[in-house]
From Swiss-Prot:
Disruption phenotype: Impaired autophagosome clearance in fat body cells of starved 3rd instar (L3) larvae. Conditional RNAi-mediated knock-down in muscle cells disrupts transverse-tubule (T-tubule) and myofibril remodeling in internal oblique muscles during metamorphosis.
Compartment(s) where it occurs, according to its Swiss-Prot or TrEMBL record: Late endosome membrane; Lysosome membrane
InterPro entries referenced in this protein's UniProt entry, alphabetically: Znf_RING, Znf_RING/FYVE/PHD
Species this chain originates from: Drosophila melanogaster
Biological role stated in the UniProt entry: Part of the homotypic fusion and vacuole protein sorting (HOPS) tethering complex involved in endo-lysosomal vesicle trafficking and lysosome biogenesis, but unlike in many other species does not form part of the class C core vacuole/endosome tethering (CORVET) complex. The HOPS complex facilitates docking and fusion of lysosomes with late endosomes and several other types of vesicles. The HOPS complex is also involved in autophagy, pigment granule biogenesis and crinophagy (the elimination of unused secretory granules through fusion with lysosomes).
PROSITE patterns xrefs: ZF_RING_2
Name assigned to this protein: Vacuolar protein sorting-associated protein 11 homolog
Annotated family: Belongs to the VPS11 family.
Keyword Transport: yes
Keywords from the UniProt entry: Autophagy, Endosome, Lysosome, Membrane, Metal-binding, Protein transport, Transport, Zinc, Zinc-finger
RING-type zinc-finger residues: 733-775
Amino acid sequence: MDISVFEWKKVDLFNIIVVPFVKIPNTAEISCYCFPESKSSTEERNIKLVICDKNRNILIYLSNWECITFKSPSTRKAIALCSLTSNNSLATVTPDINNGIHIDIFDLNRLTKKQAAPIIASAYTQPSSTPLCLNADVIDDKLFALAIGLGNGDILLHYGKITKNFSANIRQHTVSGNAVNGIHFDFKTQPLDTTQIMFVTCVQGVYCFMLKEKCIMDTKFVLDNDKGNLNYRSIMCKAGGGEINDSMLVVGRADAVYCYTPEGRGPCFAIEGAKECLAWVGHYLIVGVKNSNLKQNATTLIVLDTENKIIVFQRQFQELFYVISENNFCYIVTNSGDTDACNMLMLEKNSIDVNIRLLVEKHMYNIALRLLHREGYTSSPETALVRFQYGNHLLQKGDFSRATQEFIKTIGFIKPYAVISKLLYSRYNTYLLNYLTEWKKKNESSSCHTRLIECCIKRDQIEHEMQQDDFKHYKSPAKIKHLATLSKMYFACTPSNQVPVEEEHLLHQLLEYGPASLAVDLTTYLNNITFENVKESKNILSFCSILADHNDYCAKMLAKIIEAFPVCDEKLLFYLLVFYFKLWRLDKVTSSFVSDFIKTHSLRMDKTIIVSRLYTFFNVTQRIHGHQKNTGTLHNETIDKCIENLIKNNPDVALNENLSKRSFLMMLKSSCSTEEIKAIKIKPIFKDRLLRSIVDSANELKLVENFNEKIKRSRSMLSLYTNNPIEFRNDKCDICREMLSMQSIYFLCQHSFHEECLNYKSTKRQEKFLCIICKTRNLLSPKHSSNFSCDSSDTIAVLAKIVSIGNKLETKLMIRGRQKSDGVTCNPFN
């Protein structure tokens, strides 16, 4: 189940609601149950469910879920199997102590609250094996069919008129060597077809038999004999209601759910897993799959739309017992926390508008349309809206023909403007004409639609004429002019009484048909872009990208735009600079012209240098560098002179050392913009020291010394990592020489200790643990001996250090006495 189910498309079109007023016994007390399945009841009293418990009680649930209870005969044990017929007769199988079985037929039509249902027929027989399944049904209230499947592959069959005691009319037949776990009848009641068929499913194998009177099973058909997978559950899907044309046997295996007809195997649905239950309601197949990946008793309930091949519901239930299916409803029975009852749930379909919205969100337009057709909304505004959205989706995918077909089906519901506005481009001309033609057939044509149809027809004629002419063979100016006129009429087809084409529309036309139109008549088309349609500078760069092969034209057009809009985006200036560089490479402009353009428009130097180097424009790059250097020197000299004069005139005032010259000038300009503000008033922005141009050398030397010390420590740490691989980590404590356990401490110096052997609390220094051996060495070194305090007031501290040294010496002598080398390599990390 885990693999195949994830491959299906999923949309939750159902939900679960609780049916609290139905009281069903706990599953531990139920011995068997049955319901009509797809059998059609013609009686007024419709029975939904029959439950037989282990206390010989028979619970009958009516159509309104009212429950009537009565007991089976006192001489019988608990009922083991039961089956409900289409005329409300209940067939039961009760075993006895002699390995025999009692078969009783109850007439539920005569059941009342005060009087139990009477037994109208009974039989007793000795089966050859344990009964596993039971099915019973009637044909025109004349023939009664009853079949019991046994564990050894045999069947007990009664087929004929029912009598008070029909024990003598029961026949035993052998089907296969595997246990029979399902029996289903398919009775034909048409005058031309009276064939009575019985399907039998075994643990391995599916068979079909023709029934005849006197309990004869004739003409055995082996529908499936696959021994690779076991048959878990099976149901009969009856024809009728206009939803299913032929009756089918539905069998659930571990690999999939298979359907069979008397002619052979039918559809197959790839849902893997052990099948706990099967049901068929309308177009929906309901499958309960046992989840083998969980230790707990969990079952995944899957509802499959067999027509659209999608999963419309999927939910996991704990201890799912069984599923009750009807023509339009499905009920789910699960165990609850209450030991005396079960939970009754109903599988309910969402409202049609919610389901359509969910399908449209996942772009399942075809399924949404079929669902609307199934619900009777074939010609409705809701369906037209879905078709309009479907047409938009197809248009974006490039399927113009199918999109137009969907748009045509919306005529009468969707406003024509909504469709026409999407098909106005030249490449949609044929599809727009088809839509307008269909719209004209169903509606009265207006003058606007007539002119639009004429425009589309004219476009088709011009396109046809252009396709017949090959402009490469034209040498006559008159013919070229004629073809240019056709091109302009086709690509920019605008009636004389309408406004000119907008710039965005012209841009789309150029994207579609630019190469063809430029090849026919370059001047006319480019002039149309420049003078007629380009009224703003926002889209001009899009035209420049399309016309990349026409550098001269683009440069002139950009120059005109920049001249018309002096305060334009800097991006336009750099695009124009790029075009000038391309023309300079072709010797169409001089280097002086390009340099003058750069100086005139004051372009950013960093971007200008990058672009000029890209086009190997080095001579002007050198000029720019020289000009920038001279300008920078003059700028700095001016600032220094200004600061010097300010400090000279105000000796008590000094600048902040972190204040840049540029910031200082900006502050000075904003402060002294009026004559009322004097230099003394801006004193708070200065400090009592002059602006320093160099860093304090003493602080710099101290920083260098600190960084060198940090580098030295890092190198030492790195050396320990590189010289001590993990393979040679110490495995014994350096104090007790016992094997190290999980509670151990490792140091980078290659020493390791037990946690209880190392008194790390006494060696804690600045929140760092120190090795007891290495610390002893450091304390014995001469550089540490001078650190002892000789002050009489610190006697306790001196004694503590001396005692500590003695302890370390004793430890060191003990380690040397063991002749353990201190050079053992180890990894300090566990």
